[in-house]
Amino acid sequence: MKKISFAVLMSFLCFISLVPTVDAAVIDHDKVVGFNEVVPTTISQKAEKKFQPYLKVYSGCVPFPAVDAQGNTSGGLQPSGSSKGDCSKHTGQVYSRSTWYNGVWAIMYAWYFPKDEPSPGLGHRHDWEGIVVWVDNPSNQNANVLSIAYSGHGKFTNVQPNVRNMKDTHPLIAYNSTWPINHELHISDQVGGTQPLIGWEDLTPAARNALNTTDFGKANVPFNDPHFTIHLEKAWFR
């Protein structure tokens, strides 16, 4: 019996060694197939959808998917030509991740842009920007937004929610550049667009691994394992 089990085990290991593996790759920015939204069923999924921001892009690229289900990541674009060259139209993707932080529910939303180019010759390949929506308790039917923190140049700025910067439960966010400074987020009073929402836990393991390990140059993935808590610390409002 032991000999049979050992033989079966060795055959299985040999089979595994012969199965071809597909390594994740860096691919063209417009070839990355984003994730479809999932039907929200958990408290965190429902809250992430409820408070999903609108994004108004005033200049530069619109959001693109950064990673696909197989873990392939976007190669981005060189900052050349028009600031929105080859990146002005796409369905896009918005990523989310939530947790309790200092007794407050934090929802981080993040967008990826293939390049950050204020004007030809300036900027860099890849851009990641994000916001943190601070909520009192996502379990409450009438959960309240306590503060909104938006990113820019490695820092976060907090603002209080009001009738001008919110549409119902959704923050109004702008993406823009004040020349010659690179792009950043701002609070807005204009309703922008939305993108398919995908949460960290709903990504495939390959996609999460890619976002944890891929070098996006001067841009950091704000919601991956190495940076998530660090960015929550920067975005804290009390």
Where in this protein do the model-derived segments appear?
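Bacterial N-terminal signal peptides that target proteins for export
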Residues: 1-8
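Bacterial N-terminal signal peptides
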Residues: 10-17
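Sec/Tat signal peptide C-region and signal peptidase I cleavage site
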Residues: 18-24
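A domain-level signal for the mature, folded cores of soluble proteins
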Residues: 24-129, 140, 144-238
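Short beta-strand micro-motifs enriched in acidic
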Residues: 134-138
